[in-house]
């Protein structure tokens, strides 16, 4: 199972430097079970409205991207966030050397709990932390 981070979803929906790599990975990965969480929906809404506020996307483009993003998330195995995920995320954030932000620690904690073996993320700090939790990384540049 592969946990889908919101930044990968954004690269599928909006022009990003990594969009071609992500599209290529997804095209080669149709048999993978993708996992997400309700938190991805929240981050998606936030990321899209930031694109609108910064004039990178129009209101109409945001609406279209939001619909597409929610459809992609609906096709994933959406796992609920549990109290234990927050506790584990807090423990990860408490490790000063990790530099993890709370939202990223929450993604990692949930992915680990539900048995994901791999993380699909482009976040540098998450990519550094994931292997320490026994999670493999998708290399989008292959």
Model-assigned labels for residue ranges:
Residues 8, 40, 85, 107, ...:
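Alpha-helix capping/helix-boundary segments
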Residues 1-40, 51-64, 132-133, 142:
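Short, well-structured N-terminal submotif of metal-dependent ribonuclease cores
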Residues 8-10, 48, 52-55, 73, ...:
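Short amphipathic alpha-helical interaction patches enriched in hydrophobic/aromatic residues
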Residues 70-97, 104:
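Acidic catalytic patch
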Residues 1, 108-142:
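Acidic, PIN/NYN-like endoribonuclease modules and their adjacent C-terminal/linker elements
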Residues 31-34, 75-77, 113-118:
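Short active-site oxyanion
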Residues 36-42, 103-106:
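Aromatic- and histidine-enriched alpha-helix N-cap/loop-to-helix transition segments
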